[in-house]
């Protein structure tokens, strides 16, 4: 369907429409859009739609990830060999998980969402799936990386259906003691930009389990399970790993990785390093980024917020094209973002946006490109 005219009122101003700017270098750097579009698919849709209205612009297409869905796809397009492994999914069905091995550095890049992601449930999440989902497949991926001779294993955290604290993952490696022995000489990285602990009001069950189908009673059960498991994790590690930043990432898989000798590192920073994002940023006159839901959390430990923070000192304008937007003009100004526009608003509803996500994003990008003013990038702010 033809999209509606994007609103200026709540999400920043793009100025008068259909006035031509000189050709620009546009950095297209989105995260994934939930289960609707991978970062690679979203970047292609934005660039294609933009070109329809501004064919003279040049593009730097650099899809991003913070360790969640798309982490392996983004890295696979830049380095190493993408491999496939049939593993146990979050509800015990067999899934075909992708991972990347870079033989030059003997580094394996894994992604939790490939083995226990929400998109692998086979339907909407429910309290029952929230209780049953596990991380066994992640342990199977780690075992495969060890068999391949990995000296470094980077595990992208995010988008998981489980809240098991990595218990299933560790069970697949033979338990805590066996996992620690197997990984003693391997550098293990828990890649995420989620800094929440395992337990408590800001822990993984209370913050993230409701997004995985859990109701209040289910959250309480999950919290109790995690509290018991945390005692074992902390004892194995010899320190309080369950309270450390990142322990709550991916349903607590972060805590499991920390307990077997891993360390926490920003997933967005890992992707930025391997995609040479700093060089791309230096060449850009405008940045177009986006994600599924753009809200306050996006500005704290997610790709879009990290991009805006990096662009601000360089005075590079940033436009966000998101599935849904819940930040007002004041919040955008504070973050250094010129405008944020909603695909759902453009399409007419969330349902229509989800039904044809790539084409709706393409259409919104085309509309935004056509409506830019003629004062050049410096006039956007």
Curated annotation (Swiss-Prot):
Keywords from the UniProt entry: Kinase, Transferase
UniProt feature coiled coil, ranges: none
One example of a Gene Ontology biological process annotation: organic acid phosphorylation
Signal peptide span: none
A GO CC term assigned to this protein in UniProt: peptidoglycan-based cell wall
MF terms (GO), sorted A to Z: glycerate 2-kinase activity; glycerate kinase activity
InterPro entries per the UniProt record, alphabetical: Glyc_kinase_flavodox-like_fold, Glycerate_kinase, Glycerate_kinase_RE-like, Glycerate_kinase_sf
Superkingdom classification of source: Bacteria
SUPFAM superfamilies cross-referenced by the UniProt entry: Glycerate kinase I
PANTHER family in the record: GLYCERATE KINASE
Family: Belongs to the glycerate kinase type-1 family.
Protein name: Uncharacterized protein Rv2205c
Source organism of this protein record: Mycobacterium tuberculosis (strain ATCC 25618 / H37Rv)
